[in-house]
Amino acid sequence: MREQILSGSKIVLITFIFSAIIMILMKKVAVHINALDVPTDKEGHRHIHKKSTPKLGAVGIFLAFLFGYMLFGEQSIRMNSILIGSFIIILTSIVDDIKPIKAWQKMSGHLVAAAVIIFYGGILLNNITAFGLRFEFGWLAYPITLFFLVACTNIINLIDGLDGLSGGICSIFFLTIAIIAIAQGRYNSLVLVLSLIMLGSTLGFLLHNFNPASIFAGDGATFMGFIIGVITLLEFKGPALISFFAPVCVLAIPILDTLFAIIRRLLKGQKPFQADREHLHHQLLGMQFSQRNTVLIIYLIDILFSIATLIFVLKDKKIGMILFIILFVIVLWFVLHTSIISEKNPKLLDKIKSKLKRS
């Protein structure tokens, strides 16, 4: 295993160096083509930064990903589908970063990318084994997989509101999945190669994106979410529900934050994906934490979920599950008392009570 760890470290280091260097070029390109994130004072907008910032960071991550693949990847139909799908995601995001496009146009790009993974790559969520029972999805496997990939593609972009937040959360995810793959002896698996290459790529980006950020991921944060979705589906090819459970639990923070954001907006009569300033990180900022400390707190929570995942998968399922429940209750209590059910939102609280009475 020591040899595999050293080999994996080499992949991460080389892609990290390339990513860190390419980000310098991406800043200049972004300025040249006017792909800048300009702060605005519009009500409900989630901008925190005060100055215009280049936003092609995710393009740099994609280029580092390609570089890592050329050095360490192996050609296959699955890998080809991932490259094609990723290119579609990045191309869509570049267009949106230069001149914002409509939501349905972006969604069309995401659907096409997901379709490439499913129909060309053959990566499909076609069954699930849980509690000793096997459930076949049949033709429903196609819409289920499509929905899952599109959801993952957007989840990172939705929580990308602070310097270093998306890059750090994604790095924790890729590191955790890589550790699981190595510990289980899957040294030549596509999951491990993808995780290591993406870990180096996101860490190189994080070097420039951590507060104070000199470059943002831009709409290309969808690329990181897309790869996370693909890796999760590949992991799900394992023998049981645990294969799906691990990557989902590592993403507990963005999943819970996004879920409650959608509920909050629907209860307010807003569009579910409309930007606002009531995400978990906004609540921490409202408690007078600095932007850097807010991100570090979220890192810590995510790392604790990651540790619980590693214990659950590799050591003791009971202890891992207990840790999950404790962490989930803590996060749930915080979110409910700061974002949805809160004295800050008395009208919203009345709406919730009214809906509960009707039901």
Placement of each model-derived feature along the sequence:
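Cytosolic, membrane-interface loops and tails of multi-pass inner-membrane proteins
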Residues: L25-P54, F260-R292, I352, L356-S359
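Alpha-helical transmembrane segments of multi-pass membrane transporters/translocases
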Residues: I14-S19, L304-L310
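"…together with the soluble PPM/PP2C metallo-phosphatase catalytic core" -> "…together
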Residues: M1-T258
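N-terminal hydrophobic signal/anchor transmembrane helix of membrane proteins
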Residues: K237-A240, I326-E343
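Membrane-interface capping segments at transmembrane-helix boundaries
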Residues: L25-H32, F334-K351
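Alpha-helical transmembrane segments of integral membrane proteins
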Residues: G286-L304, V313
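Extracellular/periplasmic helix-loop-helix junctions in multi-pass membrane proteins
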Residues: I307-I325
